[in-house]
Amino acid sequence: MTLILNNTEVAQAVTMAECVDAIEDAFIEVGRGWAMSDPRIDRHMPTSKEAIAQELGIPVDQLEHKILNERLAKDAYVEPEAFNAPLIYMFKTMFGAIHKTGIAAVRTSSEVMSMPVVDGKLRYCKIPTGPGGRYTSLIQLFSARTGQLLCIMPDGYIQRNRVVATGAVGTKHLARKDAKRVGILGSGMMAGGSIEATLVVRPGIEHIKVFSPNAKHREAFVERWREQTKIDIVAVESAEAAMRDVDIAIGATNTFTPVLRGEWIAPGTHINSTTPGETDEACHRRADVRVMTWWSHSDRFDADNYVLPAAPEAHVKMFSSKRKEDNSPWRLNTPQWPTAELGNLLAGKAAGRTSPKQITFHINASAGVQFAALGGKILENARKKGLGHEVPTDWFLEELHP
């Protein structure tokens, strides 16, 4: 039988501590050579409000209102500016497999996005065009022993947890053991998850500063997480104020414009960045130790062939050639920019922090093995707890030779 899970059941199946442990185990296997990932591939094709409205069967002048209201009804948020930038259809894939657990995972995302300028910064926005203001993004788990389809689940909960749990693993091995103060840029799901995951590996955290451009959002975020964690969490008025005088600096934004500046980082700080482009070159230059989740992620911007020539210029530039320059800090593990891989760090093949004064920098990029790690743990726990709905595996099999 093949198990079908929804996001509520996924959340019930696993704790954040289990996510951190599963990610750590997976990257140890990566370092040992017994787990694999494919590069994340994004494929971009222009679409439009007119085309979306026509397919949804509504007047185009009602599209924005419909989507924004449907999201607000779910206490979720879409930047209104997202509709003012050119719209792009994006199909994204990631793959990973772990020999030890016998799990292979494929993540597929079929979505509409745009890149508006919000508060002077280029943002990455996903627009929920599915029924009820929802997204279409799935994870399929396969047996790496028999090839059979084991489970299908949405990726929303795992998407957040695989990123923040990986960041927490980096923090566990790179941040100072006596870290007490955290600064966070962002007030969305990644920021909240980063608080939860960081507390798993550094339970002694006493003070957290938060900045995001929307004052209303950051105040609500701080209030919610202060109540949930019982920790001294405060909202501050600038990115600089959030990053000054902290032991752990976390970027959890959706911007491609540098907002975390190396000049603000004190000696001894650990930087955990979740979004390509949110840190400036000074962060890379000042770091004594740089670790990337997975090297191959740094090459995904070379994939010119996956952006249609007719795509808006901003998308072509962002997703093809922007970071190809040989002297770019995104050309990782070069003599100018030496970088370790997280798996090698965990497997003892690369050095981490050796001094309390060092600045360490975890470039927390994507790797498909994250989905195999968390997906496998969720499947294991869901079966034990009786979560989800089973359907016949026969539905997904064929007699013809593929």
Regions found by a protein language model. Give the residues of each.
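Rossmann-like adenosine-cofactor binding region
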Residues: 230-325
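Glycine-rich Rossmann-fold phosphate-binding loop(s) that bind the pyrophosphate
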Residues: 187-188
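N-terminal ligand-binding/catalytic initiation module
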Residues: 1-168, 178, 369-372, 389, ...
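NAD(P)-binding Rossmann-fold cofactor-contacting core
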Residues: 201-226
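Short helix-loop-beta connector
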Residues: 174-181, 204, 266-267
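N-terminal Rossmann-fold NAD(P) dinucleotide-binding loop
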Residues: 191-192
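Adenosine-phosphate binding glycine-rich loop
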Residues: 7-10, 283-402
